[in-house]
């Protein structure tokens, strides 16, 4: 998924099912964009990682 689409899904501007939402957030985490956008992106990404919904970029590269 490209970064723009991921951001639009995360913001709720594009409709998406649960799997697409998880993929969008994982894309934002993998690219680091989650930490560069508004604060709630990073906070939400961190919560998804802590809840086991998404993996940290470090976990994926290990």
What do these predicted ranges mean?
Residues 1-62:
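Catalytic phosphate/metal-binding cores of nucleic-acid and nucleotide-processing enzymes, i.e., regions
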């Amino acid at each position: 998924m490209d970064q723009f689409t991921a951001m639009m899904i995360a913001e709720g501007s594009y409709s998406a099912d649960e799997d697409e939402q998880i993929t969008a957030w994982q894309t934002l985490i993998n690219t680091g964009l989650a930490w560069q956008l508004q604060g709630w992106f990073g906070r939400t990404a961190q919560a998804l990682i802590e809840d086991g919904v998404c993996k940290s970029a470090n976990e994926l590269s290990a």
